[in-house]
Amino acid sequence: MNYHLIIQPEAEYDIQDAFEWYESKNPGLGSEFVRAVDACLSGIGRNPLAYQVIHKQVRRALIRRFPYLILYIFDQDTVFVLACFHTKRDPKQWLDRI
């Protein structure tokens, strides 16, 4: 079963910023990043409970090949994507989004 995904605007901005940064470093790398994000989101949509809870209801899924993670909350039949964060960033920044 695929669950409904709602990507918060802040998470969309995170993905766009990372895409632009990777694309500026190496043309085509931004597109690879977006494909990796899409694959991660597909996995979350198929089985949102498979990923670790890291704070209250917030779960995280690591993005393959890139030092980023997806932060989300699963509530009944909907996944709310809160952020796409670089693993070296201060976790306090995403805590403000809860």
What are these regions (language model features)?
Residues 1-34:
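Arg/Lys-rich, positively charged N-terminal/basic patches that mediate binding to nucleic acids
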Residues 30-32, 55-57, 89-92:
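Solvent-exposed interaction patches of small proteins and small membrane subunits
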Residues 39, 46-78:
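Basic/aromatic recognition patch in beta-strand/loop cores that engages polyanionic ligands
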Residues 69, 73-98:
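Enriched for short, Lys/Arg-rich terminal
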